[in-house]
Design a protein with these regions (language model features):
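Hydrophobic h-region of N-terminal signal peptides that target proteins for export
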Residues: 10-18
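Boundary of Sec targeting at the N-terminus
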Residues: 18-22, 40
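Amphipathic N-proximal alpha-helical interface segments
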Residues: 61-88, 127
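Positively charged n-region of N-terminal signal peptides that target proteins for export
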Residues: 1-4
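Catalytic strand-loop segment that frames the active site of acyl-thioester-processing enzymes
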Residues: 7
């Protein structure tokens, strides 16, 4: 009985460890949710996709897209952006909610948005 339980436990651990490396790397935008493709075509129409990393996390898959201009965009399983980070340059102004962008322009003239993060209704930007 102990031996059978031990074998089953080892099998379970090995299967769990094997599933940990299910990341997919591609450059095909068709692998993204429709909402994510729409967002990228609206706000990054002049920039091509460098790489897409798809990471299944239970029932919620996440998508990390690196654009050729150095901006990284993370999407949730529904295709809604959750993070944008510009290593060089800035995040496209059109991608930032208008009220937040106007607030930043009024208080910090001349600054550009370097990163943005949102969860639900809250959006945070880094200038």
């Amino acid at each position: 009985m102990k031996k059978t339980l031990f074998v089953l436990l080892c099998l379970l651990i090995s299967l769990t460890a094997a599933r940990g490396g299910d990341k997919i790397t591609t450059t095909n935008p068709e692998r993204l949710p429709v909402q994510a493709r729409k967002f990228l075509s609206e706000h990054f129409s002049d920039t091509r996709i460098s790489i897409i990393k798809i990471e299944p996390k239970g029932s919620a898959t996440t998508y990390d897209v690196l654009m050729e201009n150095g901006v990284a965009v993370a999407f949730n399983h529904k295709g809604m952006w959750t993070e944008m980070d510009a290593k060089v340059g800035s995040v496209p102004q059109s991608a930032i909610p208008a009220d937040i962008l106007q607030y930043a322009r009024d208080r910090f003239p001349g600054c550009e948005v370097q990163a943005a993060k949102r969860d639900g209704k809250n959006t945070e930007i880094k200038l």
